[in-house]
From Swiss-Prot:
Protein name: UDP-N-acetylglucosamine 1-carboxyvinyltransferase 1
Documented EC number(s): 2.5.1.7
Role: Cell wall formation. Adds enolpyruvyl to UDP-N-acetylglucosamine.
Group of enzyme by EC: transferase
PANTHER family: UDP-N-ACETYLGLUCOSAMINE 1-CARBOXYVINYLTRANSFERASE (PTHR43783:SF1)
Chief place of localization: cytoplasm
The UniProt record lists the keyword Cell wall biogenesis/degradation: yes
Listed InterPro entries: Enolpyruvate_Tfrase_dom (IPR001986), Enolpyruvate_Tfrase_sf (IPR036968), MurA_subfamily (IPR050068), RNA3'P_cycl/enolpyr_Trfase_a/b (IPR013792), UDP_GlcNAc_COvinyl_MurA (IPR005750)
Length: 420
């Protein structure tokens, strides 16, 4: 079982290059099922979640080659059931349902796994597919959807769910007629998916707004597409710089995707400048308290909540964070308390009373973003932190430890009983 040894590291300096967006890569990998022609994807991060999605494709009959580029060919699909043991590992396995029904008239997915951060039901996905004419049955932990030909429909999402928006966009791309998704998610990753689908020959417009219109076509073609940079990885590095009073340039980013995080870090006292594809963060010795409510994009991202909470444990004053997207997303709090943080939880609200310092401790990462928060806390703390559960970190960050070593951070990956 691998773990990190992290020694408090302040005043880091250097540049960190951001990898491709995990949350773009996963739906776009699923979308390749919409064509029998080969698709070539650039800037795909080498992550555990990506590997699981590719394993699922291979089990369905796809030919996959993953080196510098990712090439996928889906001309010999011979299985329409997503394997349960793989689906259990990743929530995004449900994104195969829309493409399978659209191209092969049927798909079967087990109820998916991934990070256990509260109730993330598939109801909105299934409601949309039913409106498009699919027959959907839920039985013994599996969902089966069938339709001879999906039909365009008007779909109003009760909540701007990213996964439901993506699944329905993909399904609608090969449907007969026009589909309109209202109250659609507006995340940059949705825009990236639209761009990929349109390169393939789909007719999708409106991504990035809350109304997306898709006019179905008969078939789609293979294309080459470059994935956008990962805004959550970028935001994580920005918070790390602020927490460790470091001066870091984060490159290969789209600054407009980071506006909510930049605004809150400025409020907390960090100095931030940005240019075409970079953001520079200089952390200051005094961290100011900040109040935050996580919301769907363009609000403050729930995927950045654990990281900024770690920063605010060191603020001079009291901060309040309201989790507006998921319940059960405060698993990092108990671990931060072990390091000396003063945090009170009330349902979906965390009240964080800043302390003068955190102290290294043995902690466990229970999910992906909690892992990132604990890395930040470990680097900001005095002494050594031992972080277990880093397989959760590897699901969404490509070589985070190596990237941080390059700017001078003392972070070391070890196996099992190995000592620092």
């Amino acid at each position: 079982m691998e773990k990190f040894f992290i020694v408090g590291s302040h005043g880091l300096k250097g540049e960190i290059k951001v990898s491709g967006a995990k949350n773009s890569a996963l739906p776009i990998i699923a979308a390749t099922l919409l064509t029998r022609e080969p698709c070539v994807l650039e800037n795909i991060p080498k992550l555990e979640d990506v590997n699981i999605m590719l394993s699922i494709l291979k089990r369905l009959g796809s030919k996959v080659e993953f080196g510098q580029l990712l090439t996928i060919q889906n001309n010999r699909i011979n299985e329409l059931i997503i394997p349960e043991e793989l689906a259990r590992k990743i929530r995004a396995s449900n994104l195969f349902l829309g493409p399978l029904v659209a191209r092969f008239q049927e798909g079967v997915v087990p109820l998916p796994g991934g990070c256990n951060i509260g109730n993330r039901p598939m109801d909105l996905h299934l409601k949309g597919l039913r409106l498009m004419g699919a027959e959907v049955e839920e039985k013994s932990g599996f969902i089966r959807a069938r339709a001879k030909k999906l039909k365009g429909a008007e779909i109003h999402l009760d909540f701007p769910s990213v996964g439901a928006t993506e699944n329905l966009m993909m399904a609608a791309a090969l449907a007969q007629g026009t589909t309109i998704i209202r109250n659609a998610a507006r995340e940059p990753e949705i825009v990236d998916l639209q761009n990929f689908l349109n390169l393939m020959g789909a007719k999708v417009k409106g991504a990035g707004t809350d109304i997306i219109k898709i006019t179905g076509v008969n078939q789609l073609k293979g294309v080459t597409h470059k994935i956008i940079p990962d805004r959550i990885e970028a935001g994580t590095h920005m918070v790390m710089a602020a927490a460790t009073q470091s001066d870091i340039i984060i490159s290969g980013v789209i600054p407009e995707h980071l506006e909510a995080v930049m605004a809150k870090l400025k409020e907390a006292g960090a100095l931030i400048t940005s240019g075409g594809d970079w953001v520079r963060v200089t952390g200051k010795s005094i961290i100011k308290p900040v109040d935050i409510k996580t919301m769907p994009y363009p609000g403050f991202p729930t995927d950045m909540q654990p990281q900024i909470l770690a920063l605010l444990t060191l603020a001079q004053g009291t901060s309040i964070i309201s989790e507006g997207v998921f319940d059960n997303r405060f698993k990092h709090v108990e671990e931060l308390r072990r390091m000396g943080a003063d945090i009170r939880l009330e349902s979906r609200i965390a009240v964080i009373k800043g302390v003068p310092k955190l102290t290294g401790a043995s902690v466990i990462a229970h999910d992906l973003r909690a892992a990132a928060a604990l890395v930040i806390a470990g680097l900001a703390a005095e002494g050594m932190t031992v972080l277990e559960g880093i397989k959760n970190l590897d699901r969404g960050y490509e070589n985070l430890d190596l990237k941080y070593q390059l700017i001078g951070a003392q972070i070391k990956r070890v196996n099992g009983e190995e000592k620092y």
